[in-house]
């Protein structure tokens, strides 16, 4: 026996739909025609669309375009969708029409059928709510779908990624403060350089992430300008007066975010520059996180035959063949996430440039990568903080050993004896296996007392403190 089916109709004709499905004919056609990959439209985008449907219904009701019962039914169905309990009824692939029309209709159809269930009507009857005439009233996919991407990404940034990023920054700040007394050897070109404080090295990571958070916050502000009310091309055809302002005000009231209609609806519908900019800032953050992860795993390499300056928590066995091996797995996971996000940015940039005239037809791709990129970075930052940074320690003895053996401390002698003599001392020490002090004394270029005054790693690490 096959799956029970019901038949629904749209402007093309009849189509068989699973009997228990809350979606309708247009969603089913998309499932039939676009069986491509496994990437689905993100739930955050579906929930944002449902929220927008609620706001549009409320404004349409105030303008007399929907009655109180219709508004209430859309309100309740939209709320049910936002709980996530209906997520299985949004099965569409990212790889569909470039406008997102089929996902917009998926939401309209599910709301229609939820209302039918509540009202004792048959699924697919379009009673008491028609997907187009009532639920999509005063709307076009061309304005509500990109608006939903804006809303979903803005709320994700505000509620998830930025707070987690702040916690990560605070964790690094605690390490920077705790390790201010540790003097270590700096490294440039992966070679020994002059000393610095371990706390200062960590503070560089912290402040680079703080800059990233600042620019993400700026991008978040750009996302608050919505294309809602532009309908098909930006003119607002088939909307009541001030619809754009009233819908955005309704959305702002419900979310606590200052959503506004964009100054030029034609511009934000023809192009998605704010979304491209936000993705670019995610890439910037990914670049910073990737360099931090790489720095940490380099400083932690060992434990016996590497730098070993940082000690990482042993979260899990590292090898199926080498007993006792522990790997920097959180750094590796972070590096993979960041590499993925950098690739996502390239896709979004190309998609943003791919629009023609009044419409960009890469909307699902842009929305998917942006929302997924935010989610990946938020999850990676949380895991990195909890499973690596919290338990990361400094090997003070190993760090001090490297400082004592470093030849680059000779840099402090340069103002006193000149570059060439200082270079000769360092080369002599390295060639003959001497300490820097021994080579300096043999050179006769500086006295023992003056050497001790100049070669002070703590003073070299903080020359102006």
Swiss-Prot record:
This is Fumarate hydratase class II. GO terms for molecular function: fumarate hydratase activity. GO terms for biological process: fumarate metabolic process; malate metabolic process; tricarboxylic acid cycle. Its EC number is 4.2.1.2. The active site is at 189 (proton donor/acceptor), 319. InterPro entries: Fum_hydII, Fumarase/histidase_N, Fumarase_C_C, Fumarate_lyase_CS, Fumarate_lyase_fam, Fumarate_lyase_N, L-Aspartase-like. Pfam families: FumaraseC_C, Lyase_1.
């Amino acid at each position: 026996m096959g799956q029970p089916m019901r038949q629904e109709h749209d402007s093309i004709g009849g189509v068989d739909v699973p009997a228990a499905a809350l979606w309708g004919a247009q969603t089913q056609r998309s499932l039939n025609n676009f069986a491509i990959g496994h990437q689905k439209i993100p739930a955050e985008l579906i929930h944002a669309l449902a929220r927008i449907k609620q706001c549009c219904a409320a404004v349409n009701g105030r303008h007399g375009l929907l009655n109180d019962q219709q508004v209430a039914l859309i309100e309740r169905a939209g709320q049910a969708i936002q709980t996530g309990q209906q997520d299985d009824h949004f099965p569409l692939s990212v790889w569909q029409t470039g406008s997102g029309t089929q996902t917009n209709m998926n939401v309209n159809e599910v709301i229609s059928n939820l209302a039918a269930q509540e009202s004792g009507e048959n699924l697919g009857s379009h009673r008491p709510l028609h997907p187009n005439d009532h639920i999509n009233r005063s709307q076009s996919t061309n304005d509500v779908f990109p608006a939903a991407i804006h809303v979903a990404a803005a709320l994700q940034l505000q509620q998830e990624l930025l707070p987690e990023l702040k916690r990560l920054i605070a964790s690094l700040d605690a390490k920077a403060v705790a390790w201010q007394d540790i003097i270590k050897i700096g490294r440039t070109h992966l070679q020994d350089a002059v000393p610095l404080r371990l706390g200062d090295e960590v503070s560089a990571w912290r402040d680079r992430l703080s800059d990233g958070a600042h620019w993400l916050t700026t991008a978040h502000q750009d996302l608050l300008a919505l294309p809602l009310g532009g309908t098909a091309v930006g003119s607002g055809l088939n909307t009541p007066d001030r619809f754009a302002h009233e819908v955005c005000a309704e959305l702002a009231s419900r979310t606590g975010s200052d959503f506004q209609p964009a100054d030029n609806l034609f511009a934000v519908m023809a192009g998605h520059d704010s979304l491209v900019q936000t993705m670019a800032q995610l890439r910037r953050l990914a670049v910073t996180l990737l360099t931090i992860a790489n720095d940490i795993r380099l400083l932690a390499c060992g434990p016996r035959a590497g730098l070993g300056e940082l000690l990482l928590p042993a979260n899990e066995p590292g090898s199926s063949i080498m007993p006792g091996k522990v790997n920097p797995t959180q750094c590796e996971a972070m590096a993979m996430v960041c590499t993925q996000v950098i690739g996502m940015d390239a896709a979004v940039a190309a998609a943003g440039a791919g629009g023609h005239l009044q419409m960009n037809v890469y909307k699902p791709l842009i929305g998917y990568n942006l929302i997924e990129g935010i989610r990946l970075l938020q999850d990676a930052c949380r895991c990195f903080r909890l499973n690596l940074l919290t338990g990361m320690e400094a090997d003070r003895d190993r760090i001090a050993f490297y400082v004592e053996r470093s030849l680059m401390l000779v840099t402090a002698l340069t103002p006193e004896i000149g570059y060439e003599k200082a270079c000769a001392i360092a080369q002599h020490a390295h060639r003959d296996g001497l300490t820097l002090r021994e080579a300096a004394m043999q050179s006769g270029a500086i006295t023992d007392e003056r050497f001790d005054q100049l070669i002070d790693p703590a003073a070299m690490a903080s020359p102006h403190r």
